[in-house]
Amino acid sequence: TGKMFACNHANISPDIMCLSKGLTGGYLPTALAVTTQKIYDAFYSDYQEGKSFMHSHTYCGNPLACSAAIEVLNILEEEPILQNANRNAPYLTNLIREELEDYHYVGDIRSIGLINAIELVQDKASKTSFDSSHRYGYQIYKTALKKGLLLRPLGDILYFNPPLIMTREEMKKAVKICADSIREVMDSI
């Protein structure tokens, strides 16, 4: 989204967070659970005290995955990836709005950080949904994929979730493919 954690958008601090995919850039399986100091202290003790929370998984402590995770965190500290993503997020949303906001089958465009959602509707004024059996979101997903763009269809809402390092030129190209794919499918109904 352009923030280190999605909860940062809501200005909340959870007591427990589970992290995985982004830790290794998605290349190796690893995950971790992060807690407040108070929760950590409640379970930290010598084994004999019987209050330790003992758990593990087959992929825990893999040296290669841990090394990759540390390097990803170093890169996020050293390079302005999140700052650039935050700077580019409004630009991307504006591109999508300019291209699709007035299109008669787009009922809403919403965003948080770099993630944008494009809602397809049968009637723009009433926001009437399409019958789910048509699967227009999925049809648009397949059309865009053939053109080199990966969208995420959840029903008739298309999620545009680009990489944090996407350039503005790549954004322009991706938004054009997205808009062309939407029009190609929807103009044929």
Question: What kind of feature is each model-predicted range?
Answer:
Residues 1-189:
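Conserved N-terminal phosphate-binding loop of PLP-dependent enzymes in the Aspartate aminotransferase
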